[in-house]
Amino acid sequence: MTDSASHSPAQAAPSGCPLSWPQQRQNLILFAVCTGTQYLAAPVLYVGITQASLCNRLGADARTSNLPGTLFFAMTAMPALIAWLSPGVSSLRRNLSLCYATSALMLTVLAVTLALPVSNQIKVAMIILQGGISGAVMPAAIALLWEVIGRGSDESRRGLALSMAFGAGPLLAVLGSFCQTALLGGDLFGLHFAGLAYPTSFIILFAAAVPIMGLAALFSQFFVVAPVEKEAEREPLSAVGGLIAGLPLMFASVALMHCSSVPLEAADALPGSAVSRTMMQMLGGLCAGGAALSFVHHFRSILRQRVLLLATIVTILVYAGNVIPSNMNLYSEQVLGNVPLKYAGVQNMLRFGFKVVAGTVLGWFLTRTNPRAGILATSSIFLAAQIWAILVTGPWYLVAFGLHGAGELVGVYAPNYIVSASHRNELRRNLAFVTMLMVPAAPAGYLYGSIVDFVSESGWQVMGMNSKTLGFRLSFCACAVFILCGIILAIVKLPAKPRPGLDSKELI
């Protein structure tokens, strides 16, 4: 970059960005800072491990402890709804700031609730709500950040911001996880942390993220977004009708299934309990079917294309691995001999630490292979994490969280395949579609928790394993089966290098 280029608006925007270089630089720095705040608060914003350990501490069963993570991923359809409700470019900064502010408010409410002398049921409900709110606003914030940086900077100048955001960012997540370990207590590579007493430790953990999100909300106001000649108008309701119908049906399905699974001793005290439990299970199944049909209707234009349909099925199957960390954390008591909350920090640290290394290696790997290889590599690591969790006990069990963190990069390489299989004029629509593929995979988290509770309540024991250990290992097996099916389908059916001009014409 020459000095004259850095001071010339005309030269600063060779691809059409109307902003001057100082304005673009400001946007790039703010992008990196806002992304960094999300990583620093990752122990509470990446819903799963921390929330599951807290629910467990409050006496919740495995089904309930999995609900925060399930709801988090179920709400990842919200970016599409927010984009529909407020499509104007002029509202980008406001919407981004509101997302961060909403997260800060929810974290404040949760911290206060944990400090109040209220029942554990209310506290668990607030934890689940925090999972849902985080699932709604944080993916929306990420989508808005990308749109702001897309409109507010030249493509050739984004490299430094991206390296700062996604190179240093995960290191901030490691730092946040270290602080989590110091607060909750536990052992970290030979160092012992006594931690603070409960509930003070969790109150401080959630409260500490409030000012971090507050800063992100404040920084969002300083983005520079060039005005457009004509603002986009809101599309008709029919454009998002499938989502609007599918989301509440999915929530109703999980709620009905959860209510139908109350302990037998509690259910027997209710009149007509057997009938009501059966009825709730039937209604839950109908709601699940209705949700599936609604989502298929919403995505019908994409799912008519053979390669995109197959890639979607592969992605959903593999994404079922994203909702297993709650069970992996809860299993800590069985395999490590201490309560799950004592391992939440080190588990998150390994998760993000492995991700830093894997991100670098896999990026190099992709440049020398093909889009399908990226899916297969990350999916295989995902599968290895479950096999490790099934077979390994003692301190080495924790490596499963590192492998899982590296495997989570399938969330980068599966979308990359779908982008590679898409026509240029369909990219924006298909990228919006990709962000919502966690929605149909989200109920798998509740399934994993249900497996644990069912086996435990049934008292099954095999090969010297108690029912709790057996239940967790079976849930890991179920997760591994989903991932393995995705891998096999990718190998057999997906072309290594999809051809948008040819493959997308193979309509089914």
Regions found by a protein language model. Name each.
Residues 92-94, 182-211, 266-278, 452-483:
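A membrane-interface helix-boundary motif in multi-pass transporters
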